[in-house]
Amino acid sequence: MYRTSTLASKTTSTSGIAFVSPYSIPASNHTKLLSLLSHLESPSNERSESLHLNVNVPVPVQFDASEIIDLNNTKILTQSAELQSHGKNKLPSNQLKDTVNVNDEPELYLDIKTIQPTNLQEQLCIVVLNNFPNLKNIAVEKVLLHLIELGLEDRIEGQQDGKEIKDKARKFAWSLVNYEFIDLKTIFIRFNHVKDVKWFVKTFHDIDAILPKVELIYSAQIDEYLKDLEVLPSVSVTDRLKNQIKLILYNSKNLAKPKIKGFEDLDRAMQSYSDYMVDNNDLIDVPNNMKDSIIREIIRFRTKMLSIEKENRQKQIEIEREKTKQKLNKLFEGIKEASDAQQEQQREQEQEQEQEQEQGQKQKEKFATARTNNQAAETFVMPEEHEELDDKEYDAYVKAQRIAKQNKDYNQRLNAFKAKEEAERTRLELEIKRLQDYEVNVWDNKAATIAKFRNYESNGLANLYEMNYNEYLKQRVAKRTLEEELDRADIEKETQELENEVQPIKHTLDTYESKHAEPEAKRAKFNADQNEADIEVPMSPLEKDKRVIIVKELSLAKQNQIKTKIDDLVEDCLGVKDELLLDVIFQSLESSNFDGRDALVTELEEFLDEDAVKLVDLLYDFVRSLA
């Protein structure tokens, strides 16, 4: 009559279509189903037809229908004969409990700080449910109530004095740790009585059979301290409880907002392909015998593409999560190191205090023994100002000295500890600030690096002349100023060296002239007469042109005269002085002397037009005249 397999059956064809039964019911539930059917009223006028419950639905191979099948099974199994026994218009109490508004606030929820244990009893009364599903708080409390109140309803219905049993109901409070990047929660349950804790641990030691992947954590001292405590016998977990909890878990209204984002839209799209229809108007040009195969190929292709995109997004999210985890680990390691150093310092202080106390105790015993044996004068030398003190006064004096020393040491160590604490706090605050600004700094550094790399070639002097003339002038002026300062320093240094070298020579010449003044005077007169007799032959212009002139080898004074001449010629042509043209012309003259005349004229024609040739000729004539 009904399918008895616990898993959905699939029959996959060669075309990529699988046939899935929409529900599956274990054979153990046949009796429940028959009991439900026995309460149904069979109308006599309606024609009876056999129900074809063995139905297979075609779905794509890539589509996972296990969740839908599980939900259908849960809805079927949670039906009870109470629906008929309480009447058509009256719902049972447990169903009314399940219809609580999900927007209500939980009544038993406490802040995590208030649930922290302060003694051994409270520690034993706390159990933890790890990897709890991501439900809203009211749904979490509803699940906990179903678990903890297991068996109480049957006891209340089975006995007349239900009020007394309700008063003895298991009382508890709960809290949770809500992680920032993980959907699963950690639930803390604090019972009011230790016997309830033992009952809960004994009943739900395999809680993962009810709540998948949930781990029950409790104190290991429960077995030691509560082994003699008698509790109510544990109740076996019924299918009804499992189905009630499944209904809560599978109800989308009970789910909290997920923290893992990035591919929910793809999940919805893949789920929508279960009822995806291709419009036949889009396939009007396709032969009828090929339409079914093409529709299957379209659905399979879209599903495959969505699966690939979902995997890629999931990989990206995992990479980002791993980076965040590494940052947090680095931060926690720094905090742990600081905490370990602080604990080590506290242990050292405690050891030193214990040693001081032991030494004080030994010294006190030594003095007491010496006074008892009337040998205090031999074993201890009393300070002169305290020789007249009796035993009580001396003990008070020693105690005051010890306390003063301890206070002094304490203040010194306290100040040192505060200094270290402040330095460590500052370092951690800077580290936190750096981590908070990590994303912003990464983008800023990337932009700065890209801009620097992009402008690397354009920032050279060779390109600044054409691309950014003002910047070129600034750099040239700065460079020229630096060169002039270096030249002045070199001139002063050379002048000082020459003066130091000439001073002894001048002294020698003065001595020599004082001895040979008359012969030198006659010789000077003879040379003057001889020079007047000589006739100077001027050099022809052709001979001057044939001379090889090297500008770099000219003296600094002549080079300055050339620069002044260039400046005057540029001012005559343009009307204003131009430092750029001065540097360009002088550099060309230094590098090529008179060989680069044509290249210099071509370069100056951009600024001076026809005056470029005239300026170059006048400049060359001036340089020849200096040589």
Swiss-Prot record:
The protein's name: U1 small nuclear ribonucleoprotein component SNU71
Entry's localization field: Cytoplasm; Nucleus
Keyword RNA-binding attributed: yes
Domain of life: Eukaryota
Cellular-component GO terms for this entry: cytoplasm; spliceosomal complex
Primary location group: cytoplasm
GO MF term (any one): RNA binding
InterPro entries on file: PWI_dom (IPR002483)
Family membership noted in the UniProt record: Belongs to the SNU71 family.
Organism the protein comes from: Lodderomyces elongisporus (strain ATCC 11503 / CBS 2605 / JCM 1781 / NBRC 1676 / NRRL YB-4239)
Coiled coil: 300-442, 469-513
Classification of source organism: Eukaryota, Fungi, Dikarya, Ascomycota, Saccharomycotina
Positions with biased composition (Basic and acidic residues): 337-350, 359-368
Main function: Component of the U1 snRNP particle, which recognizes and binds the 5'-splice site of pre-mRNA. Together with other non-snRNP factors, U1 snRNP forms the spliceosomal commitment complex, that targets pre-mRNA to the splicing pathway.
Assembly notes: Component of the U1 snRNP particle, a subcomplex of the spliceosome.
Keywords noted in UniProt: Coiled coil, Cytoplasm, mRNA processing, mRNA splicing, Nucleus, Ribonucleoprotein, RNA-binding, Spliceosome
BP terms from Gene Ontology: mRNA processing; RNA splicing
Region Disordered, annotated ranges: 337-368
